[in-house]
Amino acid sequence: MADPIITATGLTKSFGPTQALRGIDLTVERGEVLAVMGPSGSGKSTLVHCLAGVISPDSGSVVLDGTDLTALSPDQRAKVRLQRIGFVFQFGQLLPDLTATDNVALPLLMAGRSRRAANTQAIAWLDRLGLGDQADKSPGSMSGGQAQRVAIARALVTRPAVLFADEPTGSLDSVSSESVLGAMLEVVRESGTTVVLITHDARTAAYADREVIVRDGLLSGAYASVPA
Ligand SMILES: Nc1ncnc2c1ncn2[C@@H]1O[C@H](COP(=O)(O)OP(=O)(O)OP(=O)(O)O)[C@@H](O)[C@H]1O
């Protein structure tokens, strides 16, 4: 039965004269892994930033897990992001000199958990991502694939409703990329986390349940709406 966790309706967004989004309707089902594909500059990041409440569309609405993000102030949206959304980027989100455990524990400490509880959770997530024996190493001394697993653990440790992953394996070779995507998909399937995955790469998109294609600020193709 359909159980949407994100419902976006009529999204438009311009930056000066550039119309980045020109009227997008999109529904993401709870527990679904959705790939967002499209050429460079087509509007993928702008769409995902609107879906995650990072920016507000010029018109249209985004309801995420029952909350209308477009009715909230920037501060309220920031709170929703902290509590219900995880992010993984291509690189740059980890503190390279802290240990993997400290990196993953950080969002829990920011949410007010004790150091002891945060570390226990962090180590458990590192373990789930195959890094149980790397918990005391710093991402700066790890391979790119290992560091991305730490980033994924950090994004999931707060048990977000939705994980937004923007080219999460874009800086990895194909073997590491497949291994990291496989590990990520295993833990999100286990935890029932919804994933919105931006990618240029068809092999990466193949890990998703469904793909949508953004072209010139519009969704194109037959995959834009959930099959009946
Ligand atoms: N903050 C901004 N200021 C001005 N123009 C912007 C801004 N953000 C995006 N744009 C423009 O909006 C359009 C869509 O950009 P967007 O980053 O969403 O595309 P994309 O599909 O994610 O591209 P890429 O795959 O290269 O990351 C582009 O023409 C881009 O130059």
Annotate the PLM regions.
Residues P4-V214:
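ABC family nucleotide-binding domain
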Residues E211-Y223:
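H-loop (His-switch) and adjacent beta-strand-loop-beta switch element
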Residues M1-T12, S220-A228:
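ABC-family P-loop ATPase nucleotide-binding domain
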